[in-house]
Amino acid sequence: MVEFNRVGQMITVYPKAKINIGLNVVSKRDDGYHNLETVFYPVNVHDVIDITESHQAGCDIDIEGANLACDPQQNLVVRAYNIIREHYDIPGVKVTLNKMIPSQAGMGGGSSDAAYMIKALDEMFSIGMSDDEMRLYASKLGADCAFFINPVPSYAEGIGDKLSPVSINGLDDKFLALVKPGVAVSTKEAYAGRTPSTPKKCCKDIVAQPIETWANELRNDFEDSVFRSLPILGEVKKDLYNRGAIYASMSGSGSTIYGIFEERPLDVLYAYPDYYTMIIKL
C-alpha cells in the first residue's frame, strides 16, 4: 500500500500496526518509566487518515470506526499536529480518522496515527523535515511513536525509542493470526505485576534464530501477570499453539494475541466469533 495518496486538496495516509516479537522489562528508571527491549515488527493492518487544509485554525478531527473514550482534541493525531505547529507555521486542517486497528490492543494504533500525521503534514506543506527530526517530535507523544516514522523491523531499547534495524529471516512466507478478545489491559498494572530483570539472552539474538526455536526461548514478560488477571488471553495463546502456530505471543501489554503459522489458519477466523480476528500474510 502506498504511504501517501493525494486527491485534489486532500492527502490520505495509511498508518500501519505493529506486533512485539519478544518483550523484556529490563530495569526501572529514575523517571518512573521502565527500560525494555523488544522487536517491533510492522504488519499490514491499517487505519486511514484523510487530511485537508482548513481556513480555521487548529486541527478539527472526526473519528470513525471506534468509540474512543478520550476528548477528540486529546487524540494523538491532534497532539501531533499541535507539536508540528509549535515549530512550523502551518495552517489549520480538517482530519477524518477511520480506525481499523483495534484500540487497547498492543498493536500501536494510536502511536502509528500520530507518526503518520507528522509525516503527512511534512508532505502536505513541504516542510522538509528529516526522519530524525520527525522521530524527535514523535517520541514526545509516546514511547513507540518514533518507530512508525520508518516502520521497518527494529530492535527497540530504552522506553522503546532507541531503534536499530533488525533482520528476521523466514517470516516472509508465513501467516499471522491476530485475535483480540473484548478485554482491556491496564499498562500500569501490567508493569506493576512484573519485576524487572536482565534476560539471559537478548530477544534480538533469539529472533535471528530459526522461528521453530522461538517458543522455547522468546517471551513477553507481561504475560505472566496479565494472564493471571485475564485468563482468557492465556487460553487464546494456548489454543493458537493447538491449531498449529509455530510461535504465539501477546503483543505489547495486550490484549491482542497473535500466532505465526506456516499455512493460512482459516479455522482461527471461525473459532472466535465474538472477538476481533484477522489473518494476514507476513
Predicted regions and their residues:
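Conserved, helical-rich catalytic subdomain that frames metal- and/or nucleotide-binding sites
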Residues: 59, 150, 154-247, 260-275, ...
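Glycine/serine-rich anion-binding loops at beta->alpha junctions
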Residues: 96-125, 143, 246-258
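Residue-level signal for inorganic ion chemistry
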Residues: 21, 49-51, 77, 110, ...
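Contiguous, small/hydrophobic- and glycine-enriched helical/loop subdomains that border
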Residues: 114, 118-155
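ATP-binding N-lobe of GHMP and related small-molecule kinases
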Residues: 2-105, 123-132, 168-171, 180-183
